[in-house]
Amino acid sequence: MSMTDPIADLLVRIKNAAAVGKQTVKLPSSKIKVAIAQVLKDEGYITDLRVTATENNKSELEIVLKYFEGRPVIETLKRFSRSGLRQYRGKTELPKVLGGLGIAIISTSKGIMTDAQAREAGVGGEVLCFVA
């Protein structure tokens, strides 16, 4: 099965699983999905992530969602740059999500990082998504 936008697929799977109260999300793995999930883990939005090998030399990403008092920690998860319209921002134009309460995940020349880390590193890049 061909997937047009694997990042959007990752975000929708996380959002849907959180909406129905599932503990884990399993999906096909890729380097960019693992990097985005690692940023979410580092920022405290998910509990854990695991990459496991499956048959036919494929790998599967399992994300353990985080809940606080029965509600998902991730309230908003929105794709910003999309396959039909890429959104690039310079280091001075990086967005602040909810006045700094959320994060924007940025793909830079130095890897995938949050908007705050990109500002600190002095790099801009493609704004992948917003998380709050």
Swiss-Prot record:
Keywords: Ribonucleoprotein, Ribosomal protein, RNA-binding, rRNA-binding. It comes from Xanthomonas campestris pv. campestris (strain B100). PANTHER family: 40S RIBOSOMAL PROTEIN S15A. GO terms for biological process: translation. One of the primary rRNA binding proteins, it binds directly to 16S rRNA central domain where it helps coordinate assembly of the platform of the 30S subunit. This is Small ribosomal subunit protein uS8. It comes from the Bacteria. The lineage of its organism: Bacteria, Pseudomonadati, Pseudomonadota, Gammaproteobacteria, Lysobacterales. Belongs to the universal ribosomal protein uS8 family. The keyword tRNA-binding does not apply. GO terms for cellular component: ribonucleoprotein complex; ribosome. InterPro entries: Ribosomal_uS8, Ribosomal_uS8_CS, Ribosomal_uS8_sf.
